[in-house]
Design a protein with these regions (language model features):
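Glycan-processing catalytic domains of CAZymes
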Residues: 1-157
Length: 157
C-alpha cells in the first residue's frame, strides 16, 4: 500500500481475503483492521468453492461489518463467487444459476457491505454477441442474460 501511494497519491488499495468464517468481531481482529493500511477490504464469500454455506454468509458478513465499524477504517465490500465446481471442490468452474443462487447471495450479504464485486466474470458470464467466449458458451450466456434481466428491472441511479 505504501509503495502504491508513493507512486500515486490518489490510488485506492483493495485486498480480498479468503475464509470469512474464521473471522470474529473480537478485539484482536479489530486491532488488525485498525493497523491495516488499505482503503477497502473485499472479503471473498467462499460460496462458490464450497467453503461457506449460503445460509451462513449473512452472519459472517455481519460479524465482519461490526468489526469494521469498531475499527473505523477500511470500507467493507464483498467479493462474491459466481461459480461452482464441476466436481464439488475441484474440476471446471461452472456458472451458478442467478435465480436459484446468486440473487440469494446478494440478498444475504448486501446489508453488510458497501459494494459487491464478483469473482469471476471472464469464463463465467459472456454477452451473447461476444466474438470470443471463455467457458461453456451456453451456460455463460445464460448467466449473463439472467443477470441482465434482473439488472434492467432495478432502479439504480
Amino acid at each position: 500500500a505504501q509503495v502504491a501511494k508513493s507512486l500515486n497519491t490518489n490510488c485506492v488499495n483493495i485486498i480480498a481475503p479468503y475464509n470469512i468464517k474464521k473471522e470474529k468481531c473480537d478485539d484482536y481482529f479489530v486491532r488488525q483492521l485498525e493497523q491495516l493500511n488499505v482503503e477497502i477490504v473485499a472479503y471473498q464469500d467462499g460460496v462458490g468453492v464450497g467453503a461457506t454455506r449460503l445460509e451462513d454468509s449473512a452472519r459472517y458478513y455481519e460479524n465482519l461489518s461490526k468489526a469494521h465499524q469498531k475499527a473505523g477504517r477500511s470500507r467493507i465490500w464483498a467479493d462474491m463467487e459466481l461459480f461452482y465446481f464441476e466436481q464439488t471442490t475441484h474440476g471446471s468452474l461452472l456458472p451458478a444459476d442467478f435465480d436459484n443462487r446468486i440473487i440469494h447471495q446478494m440478498e444475504a450479504i448486501s446489508p453488510f457491505v458497501d459494494k459487491i464485486l464478483v469473482y469471476q466474470y471472464l469464463g463465467i458470464m459472456n454477452k451473447p454477441q461476444s466474438k470470443a467466449h471463455a467457458g461453456l458458451r451456453g451456460e455463460t450466456v445464460r448467466l449473463y442474460n439472467q443477470y441482465m434481466d434482473w439488472y434492467n428491472k432495478q432502479n439504480f441511479k
